[in-house]
């Protein structure tokens, strides 16, 4: 049924469909009786899925990745829709419109997306107002990025401005230095630039702080970020963001070229995201929390990430192509995998398949 609906929706511009679908999700979870009904249908409440990660209780390991709920307007929707947590944003200190449309593109042949949104959002103050009004529910992380007009030299102060507003209201913070759609942002992943930025954010909040990295980093740079995270006492690393690479796609080259710049998400990034996760786990073991995102569509893929060292996993493009029952399918499947493997909980499986 959803496959047929997807074909109809794909006749409309991607960003318009996003707004319509997101509005529908917020509507059906706004009122208590309907919210409870949706939750009974979509939530998998199974004790083997629970995990305590950086001191927070996660009812299930699959969360919504940043990029869908940019302004935290849907924070009360994600739990009833079956997710174990959600990451809102990316939020910047100042409101900004992002890049000109069209800026979101589908690659159905690859079940992928290309976006060059450019951190369009209404600013950290606006997101803080929404977070302040949220109901008790699943953990919510705030993903913060650099305001486009702010110079790189002033990035620590810019990130800190967002952290001051969102830190008291979110359950954890994610510092995004890996989007390809803000000029110069990925340069902040270099350790000499990243150290003062992360230190400034850490000094301004009391909640756990993680950093989100790109799949396009070299292996040496992945190691360097991991070492820095340990040095500074970060809670963890989110790996990975979208990729600027375009190799191995089923979509014709001329169509991809016509789309132009942007970050590619979905199955084409899965292999590299898994490689980065494995490298990080080999480097840091259980000293940092690893959240794996990038190309996860199936139960087997989510389970593979957990065995490779991910305490939590995330999806966005998988949700778009998988539909409203996607999170439920993943969680039902993971609960089955946990029991079949003889573990008492998903926490016991984290890193169990990693090469020692």
Swiss-Prot record:
UniProt xrefs under InterPro entries: Aldolase_TIM, DHO_dehydrogenase, Dihydroorotate_DH_2, Dihydroorotate_DH_cat, Dihydroorotate_DH_CS
Listed GO MF terms: dihydroorotate dehydrogenase (quinone) activity
Binding-site positions, substrate: 70, 115-119, 176, 181, 241-242
Topology term for the membrane: Peripheral membrane protein
Known pathway: Pyrimidine metabolism; UMP biosynthesis via de novo pathway; orotate from (S)-dihydroorotate (quinone route): step 1/1
EC number: 1.3.5.2
Catalytic activity entry: (S)-dihydroorotate + a quinone = orotate + a quinol
First and last residue of the signal peptide: none
Superkingdom, taxonomy of origin: Bacteria
CDD domains: DHOD_2_like (cd04738)
Alphabetized NCBIfam families for the sequence: PRK05286.1-2, PRK05286.2-1, PRK05286.2-5, pyrD_sub2
Assembly notes: Monomer.
The protein's role, per its UniProt record: Catalyzes the conversion of dihydroorotate to orotate with quinone as electron acceptor.
UniProt-recorded name of the protein: Dihydroorotate dehydrogenase (quinone)
Record organism: Rhodococcus opacus (strain B4)
Gene that this sequence comes from: pyrD
